[in-house]
Design a protein with these regions (language model features):
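Bacterial Sec-dependent N-terminal signal peptides
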Residues: 1-26
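Amphipathic alpha-helical coiled-coil scaffold segments and their short linker/junction regions
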Residues: 30-34, 86-89, 226-227, 261-324, ...
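Small/polar, glycine/serine/threonine/aspartate-rich low-complexity segments that form flexible
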Residues: 69-141, 269-281, 311, 324-355, ...
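Acidic, low-complexity, intrinsically disordered peripheral segments
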Residues: 66, 73-75, 82, 263, ...
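Periplasmic alpha-helical coiled-coil/stalk elements that build and connect Gram-negative outer-membrane
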Residues: 158-164, 168-288, 398, 402, ...
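A glycine-/polar-enriched beta->alpha junction
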Residues: 31-41, 48-63, 99-133, 141-159, ...
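Amphipathic alpha-helical coiled-coil segments
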Residues: 42-57, 174, 178-199, 215, ...
């Protein structure tokens, strides 16, 4: 008996009519897409990349400790040696020349230079003569300072934090874009499911009405033409049902793929209600958009980068100089300890420069190109700001209009459904023509679809405004993840 019960359960579960359904709301689909979709994983990876790029930038302004050297530096060969009389002889050499250098350096953002301290040890082994010598720098301090040149460190310090902030805001925008995309796929399936429900109901209703019409024809209450019209309606309903089933299957697959879901259960989507009606202050929307959006940060970054190009062109096309100076102690000897006994002063000063004298206007041309690019960037940013503001105004107005539109289409849906029910009952009582019944059916279907499409437009507009402002107007707070 127990085995029979188990077999019955397995039969009903596997039978198509008893297929398991998974009911999902719009909020659940959005949450799943943000959590497990490929797009969400790409957004997380992009945020990690942005974080480590900024960490790398910060590290450039901190002291750098490094150890470099050559161990071993072994050579065994014949080399030419010029003799006092001008002749050349070839002598065998066999030696090892090893070097270790420990250096601590610090970049100076204000000037673009570098200061450093270092210690160096060198050992030379002459295997042919069985001789070993040591040379070393126990201590040395130095500076490398560009003069009249472009300061990359200074400008990076202005631009890189903006890039980091821009990347963080882009991550939030990416998740909100995922919510918008998921909403699109959600309503694509929901519309398909509603069309399927309409098609199933229309097929069932047309089948019932056709059978009633056959009985009426036998009683002489309707004409043969009316019966044929109802038969055509039944065939059309059957064809629409097949198309609706295919569309629903395709839309379901697309939604599952976007969510990253491998659940084989059929999806049954809930018809979402519109969000609680809330007032949207256009000024607040603009302020939040310019405070939160990555594009707003990008406006400042683009202007700084344009100014950076101008400064680079001016600095690098004129007098360029570089000052290198060191001061330290050095010594040599037969033992390592000899290097540290009574070391001698070690100084080095070098000033290198390049002064363009005749360039045939090349340097001026480069500077003018940079200035023109800066002017173009300013104009582009100004245009982008105007477009940005226009998008906010448009989206705020659209959402406010759609809040009202949803209520009207919902009311029209209820009225059309009631009207169809009355028309159907009147037709059964032979109080309504086939044509009028068909009109009521079409109006019912159109009103239902219009309501679902109005909901789709509303929720897409809702999430679009969130993307544009990165602000939650329901909760009155900034969006953060």
């Amino acid at each position: 008996m127990k085995n029979l019960f188990t077999l019955l359960i397995a039969f009903f579960v596997s039978f198509p009519g008893f297929a398991q359904l998974r009911s999902l709301s719009l909020q659940e689909v959005v949450a799943m897409a943000k959590e497990q979709s490929i797009a969400s994983k790409q957004a997380v990876t992009a945020r990690k990349t942005n974080y480590w790029q900024y960490r790398s930038f910060q590290a450039d302004y901190k002291p750098q400790l490094s150890l470099n050297g050559t161990i071993p530096g072994f050579t065994r060969s014949y080399i030419q040696v010029t003799q006092p009389d001008g002749t050349i002889s070839f002598e065998q050499v066999s030696n090892n020349n090893s070097l270790l250098n420990l250096s601590l350096s610090q970049s100076i953002a204000l000037t673009g230079g570098t200061v450093y301290v270092q210690q160096q040890t060198q050992r030379f082994d002459d295997f042919a003569r069985n001789n070993t010598r040591y040379n070393g720098i126990p201590f040395e301090i130095g500076i490398s300072q560009p003069l009249f040149r472009f300061n990359t460190l200074k400008w990076d310090r202005k631009i890189q934090p903006l890039k980091y902030q821009e990347g963080n805001q882009q991550f939030i925008q990416s998740l909100e874009q995922i919510a918008l995309d998921a909403t699109g796929y959600y309503f694509e399936l929901l519309v398909a499911q509603v069309n399927l429900q309409i098609a199933e109901k229309n097929r069932s209703n047309n089948d019932t009405l056709y059978k009633i019409a056959q009985h009426k024809l036998a009683l002489g209450k309707i004409s043969q033409n009316d019966l044929l019209q109802l038969q055509m309606g039944l065939l059309t309903a059957q064809k629409d049902l097949a198309s609706a089933q295919q569309a629903a299957a395709v839309a379901s697959l697309k939604l599952k793929m976007y969510m990253g879901s491998r659940d084989e259960r059929e999806l049954e989507l809930e018809i979402p209600l519109e969000a609680a009606e809330f007032a949207i202050n256009t000024r607040l929307a603009l302020d939040e958009a310019f405070a939160n959006r990555s594009a707003a940060v990008g406006f400042r970054r683009k202007l700084l980068e344009a100014e950076q190009e101008v400064q680079f062109a001016k600095k690098e096309n004129g007098l360029n100089a570089s000052l290198n100076a060191t001061f330290g102690l050095s010594n040599q000897g037969a033992r390592p300890s000899d290097v540290y006994m009574n070391p001698q002063d070690r100084e080095f000063v070098e000033l290198q420069f390049t002064l363009p004298i005749m360039t045939w206007g090349r340097n001026k041309a480069r500077t003018e190109v940079a200035k023109a690019n800066k002017e173009f960037a300013q104009q582009s940013v100004e245009q982008d700001k105007l477009t940005f503001e226009q998008e906010i105004f448009t989206q705020v107005t659209l959402l406010q209009m759609l809040q009202k539109q949803v209520k009207l289409t919902k009311l029209a849906d209820n009225i059309a459904a009631d009207r169809y029910q009355i028309a159907k009952e009147r037709f059964i009582l032979s109080d309504l023509s086939v044509t009028d019944l068909g009109i009521a059916t079409q109006e019912k279907d159109i009103a239902r679809r219009d309501y679902i499409l109005a909901l789709r437009d509303y929720w897409q507009s809702y999430y679009s405004l969130r993307i544009l402002t990165l602000y939650d107007f329901e909760q009155n707070k900034k969006i953060a993840y």
